[in-house]
Regions:
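Intrinsically disordered, low-complexity regulatory segments
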Residues: 1-147, 156, 228-231, 239-255, ...
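Conserved nucleotide-binding/hydrolysis micro-motifs of P-loop NTPases
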Residues: 6-9, 26-32, 91-95, 118-124, ...
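Basic, low-complexity terminal or inter-domain segments flanking catalytic cores
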Residues: 10-11, 18-20, 158, 191, ...
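C-terminal or mid-to-C-terminal helical accessory/interaction module adjacent to the motor/catalytic core
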Residues: 67, 73, 80-81, 120-204, ...
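A conserved hydrophobic secondary-structure block that centers on an alpha-helix together
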Residues: 90, 287-289, 293-301
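C-terminal helical "lid" subdomain and adjoining coupling/linker elements of P-loop NTPases
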Residues: 164-168, 183-245, 293, 439
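Pre-Walker A segment
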Residues: 250-279, 284, 290, 477-483
């Protein structure tokens, strides 16, 4: 039996007898060749540009995945002693494609059966063994078509970006619309004009004084008071409402607060309502809720969920269906009744159906595995950290989905104050909500993204018992100013939601898209918010002007629907690819669109006027402000051109004309000599660079002179020699740990100040602690538990467990050339598109396998300590025969 991962193989092996040998392919064993790796003899053929022959049925050129030669040899060797082959890869498109590639490469001479399951339990595995099927060729072709169209899109458009904007940029079928959404939201924020308004709130007491409550002014003589929702995004007031400014609001508050004014309840209305539980998780809703509740990225969520699935704790994590099987419904209802009481369970089983048209993903929601769900408490000794938190989230959501509606009662009271001194009557309103029956709320409550102009005072609360005509006493009255807020930036959760609502992408792609747009430098994260970089504005503007249809949301969604039709066998893949690439009567194809880009001035493409005199430009080394002044004047070149750096932390919507002028008007930071280092006799210089101000020891013989960045709390204008020498002395040795004999050093990094002892780090609270903390203070920090420490500073950064091939313990470390993974025998560099934080164990094992393959080493064998290098190993490649039946 062949599965994708060692962890999955290990779990399944527990449920099968000795007659089965369960092996892992560790992901794909064959992939579409990168164009740069196309063999020489094919470079000048139709395969040369894309590794896809677009002139002959879009035939792809496949090659063995790096590091998989040994895996293939092992699988072939195992097949020799087998009398049957079960392909047990995942049940989605990707899993079906892996199974097909295994067949193509292994060419088994024994009977082959395809088995699928959505959870790894003994019962599910046995059920899958009893109900095998043939390979789904439509699914395979759908995956292949997606891979080809993504290759055509990326490799046709990206080179245009290199020529017109900058090298290293990339475009993607789903990636580019995702970036466009983020950029468009930032454009809305940049165009937004904030408006000011006031409201008046009062705190009333009942006559008995038993309970006070807050109410908000709603009308004045019947005219509604303006709130944040009454302004458009340009700050214009809409609707027939009364706008209170500071003077009128203060005068009104004073009038309400005068003694002798009549205050009485004019109406009390109670409205019962019910709240239904949320549906069980799909891939996208799991990513959204894990982001909101657990602060996990989409990739962290998927990696954690994959681990839970492979260990047999949850069902398959890539699905767009919220449906539960009858077995799962029974398990959820039974557990809800046991833990929360029989009356907490819905009268009848709840059946959820999905809205997605994509019929080719897994067909059940993400839920705890098995006929009886394990409670989080039962797994508390087995699951830890993110794994436990995510399992608990899934368990709660699943159980709650079969529980009864919550019953809620909302009471709204209207209170009349007046007549006031001018004869007008002010009407206040107060609402209180109480839960009369908790139902599913006993287990779980869904989170939501924060709304714009949200009034925190209207949070749920309980009102005292009030009656119409009842007199009240005024406790206090306050006038408060407010500013309307711009549209909120996307978070990973809300961006996934937007993509899903627009029909862009599929469950299996969202996590990769979130990671890619950040890794490729188009988007950064500020807390949970996604902030576009200026280069994203440049790229999206260029794509909108030249490839508008290709990044149009509706067009991208229609492509997804077409690809689903291919999976259903309703569309011919080759005909569809031909229409997409070469075009037809109804549209210009990608090929002609890319080839007919008009000549454009690169400076114009990369320019954004901030004012008539100030222009923002995106360059090779990032964004900057350009102005022209008197040639030869301070900061200007002979043509009068002056460059002003933009602070790295300044978001695009914060670069207003006023802010740009402030940056231009700021004192010019010039390089200067601060003095002489008494220890070396070399000058200490102050400089201002792309990443901010720094000091440098001007050693003419040093290949890389010693530097030190200024702390955020330091001013370039007041930096002196003493402070500069302190910066150049870092890292500072605080003292020696008496237990280990290791030096403890204090230093500053990208994520702030920290201590380092050997391979162990601890964060410091403030930058000045770097110079002030003593040995006793440092030892006290190390005596405290380490909570989510600095991954980039500590070594090892992560532990992945035992490598299934070498048996070594795999860890992630950082070295002179960046992060890498090691099993104690071999080190493998972590590619720039991967991150240590989000890396799964299987990915770490795969990198080590590829490295061993490249070095020609067996698992557990270390490289010879010599400078000699062996001959470069050539990866065998195969071309899928045209029209070959799968």
């Amino acid at each position: 039996m062949i599965v994708e991962s060692p962890a999955k193989a290990k779990t399944i092996s527990k449920y099968l007898g000795s007659e089965f040998e369960v092996l892992a392919s560790v992901g794909h064993i064959r992939e579409l060749v990168e164009p740069k790796n196309v063999p020489k003899e094919l470079k000048k053929t139709a395969f040369g540009k894309f590794a896809v022959d677009v002139d002959n049925g879009f035939t792809p050129l496949y090659g063995i995945t790096a590091g998989k030669t040994k895996t293939i040899q092992d699988l072939k060797a195992a097949l020799k002693g087998a009398d049957e082959l079960f392909l047990a890869t995942d049940e989605d498109r990707e899993g079906e494609a892996i199974a097909w590639h295994l067949l193509e490469v292994l060419k088994p001479k024994v009977p082959v059966k395809r088995m699928v399951f959505h959870e790894i339990t003994k019962e599910a595995i046995q059920e899958a063994l009893n109900h095998t099927r043939a390979l789904d060729n439509d699914l395979v072709e759908a995956q292949e078509t997606r891979r080809i169209v993504d290759r055509l899109f990326g490799y046709e458009i990206s080179p245009v970006l290199w020529r017109k904007i900058n090298r290293g940029l990339s475009a993607g079928r789903v990636q580019s619309p995702a970036v466009r959404l983020v950029v468009e939201r930032e454009r809305e924020r940049m165009a937004f004009v904030s408006a000011s308004y006031y409201d008046v709130k009062a705190v009333f007491d009942t006559a008995a004084g038993s309970q006070s409550f807050e109410a908000k002014l709603q009308t004045l003589d019947g005219k509604r008071i303006a709130s944040g929702d009454n302004f458009d995004d340009l700050g214009n007031l809409t609707g027939n409402v009364l706008l209170l400014d500071e003077a009128s609001a203060s005068a009104l508050a004073d009038a309400v607060g005068k003694s002798g004014v009549d205050i009485s309840v004019t109406s009390v209305e109670a409205k019962p309502s019910t709240r239904r539980p949320a549906a069980p998780f799909t891939t996208s809703t799991l990513q959204q809720e894990a982001s909101r509740k657990l602060r996990m990225s989409a990739k962290q969520t998927m990696d954690t969920a994959q681990g839970l699935y492979q260990e047999g704790y949850i069902t398959y994590m890539r699905t767009d269906s919220p449906t539960l099987s009858s077995q799962a419904i029974n398990a959820a209802r039974t557990q809800a009744a046991k833990m929360f009481g029989a009356d907490s369970v819905a009268d009848a089983p709840r059946v959820y159906t999905g809205k997605s048209k994509n019929a080719q993903e897994a067909h059940e929601a993400i839920r705890p595995a098995g006929e009886v769900f394990k409670t989080p408490a039962e797994l508390s000794s087995l699951l830890h950290g993110r794994a436990y938190d995510l399992y608990e989230l899934i368990w709660k959501r699943t159980v709650a989905s079969q529980m009864a509606d919550a019953k809620v009662s909302t009471t709204t009271a209207r209170i009349a104050v007046g007549p006031l001194g001018d004869g007008r009557v002010a009407e206040f309103s107060a609402s209180g909500t109480v839960v009369t029956f908790r139902g599913f709320l006993a287990a779980y409550e869904e989170s939501y993204d924060e709304a714009r102009n949200q009034d925190d005072s209207q949070a749920e609360s309980k009102l005292p018992n009030l009656e119409v005509g009842q007199k009240l006493k005024l406790d206090s009255v306050t006038a408060k100013d407010h500013q309307t807020t711009p549209p909120p930036r996307y978070t990973e959760a809300s961006l996934v939601k937007a993509l899903e609502e627009d029909g862009i992408g599929r469950p299996s792609t969202y996590a990769a898209i979130m990671s890619n747009i950040i890794a490729k430098g188009y988007v950064t994260k500020r807390g949970q918010a996604l902030v576009p970089e200026w280069i994203a504005f440049t790229v999206i503007r260029f794509l909108e002007q030249n490839f508008g249809k290709m990044i149009d949301y509706k067009f991208t969604a229609s492509m997804e629907e077409d690809l689903d039709q291919i999976a259903d066998g309703k569309l011919d893949a080759k005909a569809w690819l031909t229409h997409f690439y070469f075009g037809g009567d109804d549209m210009t194809g990608l090929k002609d669109t890319a080839e007919n880009i008009l000549d454009q001035d690169p400076r114009a493409i990369n320019s954004y006027p901030i004012t008539d005199a100030i222009t923002l430009r995106t360059g090779q080394y990032g964004p900057y402000i350009e102005i022209f002044q008197e040639p030869g004047s301070e900061g200007a070149d002979e043509n009068g051109r002056r460059i002003v750096n933009i602070p790295e932390e300044l978001a695009p919507d914060e670069l207003t004309p006023a802010k740009a002028q402030e940056l231009v008007d700021a004192p010019i930071i010039t390089d200067r000599v601060l003095g002489v280092d008494p220890a070396t006799g070399f000058e200490v210089l102050f400089k201002d660079g792309r990443y901010g101000p720094y000091v440098v020891l001007n050693d003419p013989d040093a290949a890389k002179p010693k530097t030190g960045s200024l702390f955020k709390s330091m001013s370039p204008a007041t930096i002196d020699l003493e402070t500069a020498l302190q910066l150049l002395s870092l890292p500072r040795v605080v003292g020696v740990d008496p237990e280990t004999g290791l030096d403890i050093t204090a230093q500053n990094g990208k994520f702030g100040p920290y201590l380092m002892k050997g391979k162990d780090s601890r964060s410091l609270g403030a930058e000045d602690e770097i110079f002030s903390i003593d040995l006793a203070g440092a030892l006290a920090r190390y005596a405290e538990p380490k909570y989510g420490g600095r991954r980039t500073a500590a070594t090892p950064l992560r532990e992945f467990g035992e490598d299934p091939a070498s048996g070594g313990q795999v860890v992630a470390k950082t070295g002179q050339f960046g992060p890498y993974v090691s099993d104690g025998f071999v080190n493998a560099t972590v590619p720039k598109d991967d991150t240590i934080e989000d890396m799964s164990p299987d990915r770490a094992f795969e990198l080590l396998m590829a490295r061993r393959e490249k070095l020609g080493l067996e698992p557990g064998q270390a490289p010879a300590k010599s400078s000699g290098r062996g001959a470069k190993k050539t990866t065998a490649r195969t071309v899928k025969a045209k029209g070959k039946k799968k």
